[in-house]
Amino acid sequence: MSIPLEQPENVVVLRQTMYLLSLMTILRDQQTGHSEFVRTANLIINMLMQEALSALPYKKCLIKTSSGGTYTGVQPARDICGVSILRAGESMEYGLAAACNYSVPVGKLLVQRDETTFEAKLMFCKLPKDAQDRLVLLLDPLLATGNSVILAIQTLINKGIPEENIVFVNLIACNEGITNVFAKFPKLRMVTASIDPELNANKYVVPGCGDFGDRYFGTC
């Protein structure tokens, strides 16, 4: 089980139930096959989307029920959109769409990491045309050094999206990455399923789960 350090107050970690821990065990196991990896990842992603959407602002609304009564409920107070960091972030798009009745626009960012310097470079950016007026869920399953996510967040800010309107949704993070990201963006909000203690010499999360994109899309 991962042992997180004290985290910024804007970081929400899913409740570490036995069920979630069992899913994380399957996800991390190098013996887990492709179809089981995808099934397990999707279950965790669904949990993350529920938590992320619960953190967004809501407003009261009055509806009529099929029984002839009225009900005071809530509905989102702001429109949202997703932005996935390619390619691994695309694995989280279906979970977001399913949680929002498939009506949420999704943008794409391609950020590549130099395997020698570990620096990130923006290669492609396509956002929904009104992204600056929406709350943005930034999707990337793994957070290692934080360089790619920092570049992605700065790109969103440069496009007119306020830092406080960005929620980073993530499966596995590490302490170093969280520290680096929040040192630059303290108003950011983050939802993750697990926080691992360290990076290895190649700057991969340990214990981690391997290359998430390769395992999810079956290219390993």
Curated annotation (Swiss-Prot):
Regulation: Allosterically activated by GTP.
Pfam family, one: UPRTase
Reactions listed under catalytic activity: UMP + diphosphate = 5-phospho-alpha-D-ribose 1-diphosphate + uracil
Any one Gene Ontology BP term: UMP salvage
GO molecular function, one term: GTP binding
Gene3D superfamilies to which the protein is assigned, alphabetical: 3.40.50.2020
Keyword GTP-binding set for record: yes
Residues bound to GTP: A77, R78, D79, I80, R134
This protein's name: Uracil phosphoribosyltransferase 2
Species whose genome carries this gene: Schizosaccharomyces pombe (strain 972 / ATCC 24843) (Fission yeast)
